């Protein structure tokens, strides 16, 4: 059941540890599970992290310890990752951030890295960035939000990302990835003029 603030639209959904992603049907959609473990490390599971590939734009959801190692194994291009979404401030969902941020700096990244999270992450990470990541070639931009209500936290010309309030021991949310409706490319007058059969319209 969707939160009352989320429109009840037709979407596919994927259940992940703590985080729930809803996505509409898109031209290209890939989900890479980098880690699905809990707080205690094991030899078989990395801590929680997923990467969504939407039309070759990469969006990371949570960044547990070891996320960047798994990112390399998945052969995903670091340069296409510009937005990271953190569901809540437990360590197994964000301990991998510092290593990833540092690696981006060593690789000579220049594009901004946007980190979206519940309130409190910037306060936690700012001293670490100031100590370990001085004079980086790029800027880390924090975007903090309230998890009590759905909030639009990302938008481009083809899609939006909205938070979904979730119940957990601390403030927590999932993320709704939704494709924007495309403009109608069928001109009714031309359909009538050329008498295009209805069964052919789906192919246009």
Language-model-detected regions and their locations in the chain:
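Structured loop/turn residues at beta-strand edges in well-structured enzyme cores
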Residues: 76-79, 138, 157-159
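Metal-dependent phosphodiesterase/nuclease catalytic metal-binding core
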Residues: 146-204
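Conserved beta-strand hairpin/beta-sheet module of binuclear metal-dependent hydrolase folds
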Residues: 21, 26-74, 112, 175-177, ...
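Generic structural signal for residues in well-ordered beta-strands
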Residues: 31, 140-142, 161
